């Protein structure tokens, strides 16, 4: 999900690579679940996120829609996101003790936090969001250890390709922003990459079409 911001205003002014140390370790988020509340529709899910959730919960995409995933407009197209529920607008997958019930399969955005990504011509780098996390006594940790994803090189390739693919779809809609075109593009993305899970591993041949 794109954000139109000045990165200098929300970060420590540094950009990080996967092997850099960054003060992001929240020590298991002991006694805190602030970042799991009030996120609106901002926790947008990638096809790989959905694939992991389906495996973790033994559920289809349709079943996930009844458990805590919803559809909303994101950067011009309709994409799935984690739903917030109740008066406290808590993540649907947060239990009564304020702990994540899908931690092993948590979405990419959740794995990153309090880091963010800034996309460049070739790939991306990370930045530390200094005002987002309520934990003030965070420890230093290597970026790739914090994100904790298997086969990080392939995962990063997927993230870059998925970002480029969505950007291409947005450009298509800039030239034809009619409701019919927006619906056609959105349904194509949802059916191909989420419902049918044509793409479930970081080797996005279909994204290059």
Kindly label every feature range from the protein language model.
Residues 154-157, 185-186, 202:
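Alpha-helical protein-protein interaction elements
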Residues 2-177, 193, 197:
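Hydrophobic scaffolds flanking metal-cofactor catalytic centers in soluble metalloenzymes
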Residues 199-209:
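Single conserved hydrophobic/aromatic residue that forms the stacking wall/gate
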């Amino acid at each position: 999900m794109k954000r139109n911001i000045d990165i200098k205003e929300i970060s420590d002014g540094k950009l990080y690579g996967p092997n850099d140390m960054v003060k992001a370790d929240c020590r298991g988020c002991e006694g805190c679940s602030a970042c799991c509340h009030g996120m609106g529709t901002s926790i947008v899910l990638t096809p790989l996120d959905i694939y992991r959730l389906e495996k973790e919960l033994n559920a289809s995409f349709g079943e996930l829609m009844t458990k805590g995933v919803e559809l909303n407009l994101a950067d011009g197209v309709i994409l799935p996101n984690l739903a917030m529920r109740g008066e406290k607008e808590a993540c649907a997958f947060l239990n009564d003790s304020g702990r994540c019930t899908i931690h092993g399969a948590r979405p990419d955005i959740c794995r990153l936090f309090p880091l963010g990504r800034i996309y460049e011509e070739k790939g991306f780098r990370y930045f530390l969001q200094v005002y987002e996390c309520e934990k003030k006594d965070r420890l230093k940790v290597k970026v790739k250890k914090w994100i904790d994803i298997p086969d990080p090189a392939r995962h990063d390739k997927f993230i870059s390709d998925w970002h480029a693919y969505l950007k291409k779809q947005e450009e298509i809609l800039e030239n034809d922003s009619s409701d019919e075109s927006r619906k056609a593009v959105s349904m194509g993305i949802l059916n191909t990459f989420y419902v049918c899970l044509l793409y479930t591993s970081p080797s996005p041949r279909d994204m290059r079409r």
